[in-house]
Amino acid sequence: MKIKILFLILLLSNVAKSQQKLYTKNGSITFTSKAPVQTIEAVNNKVLSVWETATGNIEFSLLIKGFQFPKALMQEHFNENYLESDKFPKAIFKGVIENSKNILFTNDNVINVKVNGLLTMHGISKQITIPAAIKIKKGEVSALSNFIISLDDYAIKIPSVVSESINKKINVQINIPLFKPLTK
């Protein structure tokens, strides 16, 4: 009888954990443009993300002006001329993790997944699929992703004067160091 009760408690705790919302306010997104003249990199360390583990729904949101560049002039051009951050202040990704029901939160492991969703940036929404690695260690959950986007897909125009300095294919790296349970 005691074994049945213990098993039931373990089962219910795993079900409860698998149905929670996990979030972070301190995720980071780094983008890199490698071009013949220079490499440009910027980081935004204030990425908000919420993951509903029961459904696999996941969302990322960030303010475009949150990207930090090594040079102030780069940041100014990025916000005013390319991403027009006053007009389009946010980038948002809403997606679903494929086969999320197979993720066991009780085991330490790394699970490679695909995330299908809609990336909205610069006023344009585009369906994309991105690879991600979800790491579970001692009950803590983190996630990494690395993928490429095209500036043309989001109508981001690069003047010909600087076209040798900016690659139209941008590498995007997402790092969510620790998801925490979202409490009401």
Question: Predicted regions span which residues?
Answer:
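Bacterial Sec-dependent N-terminal signal peptides
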Residues: 1-21
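Low-complexity, acidic/polar, glycine-enriched regions of mature
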Residues: 19-184
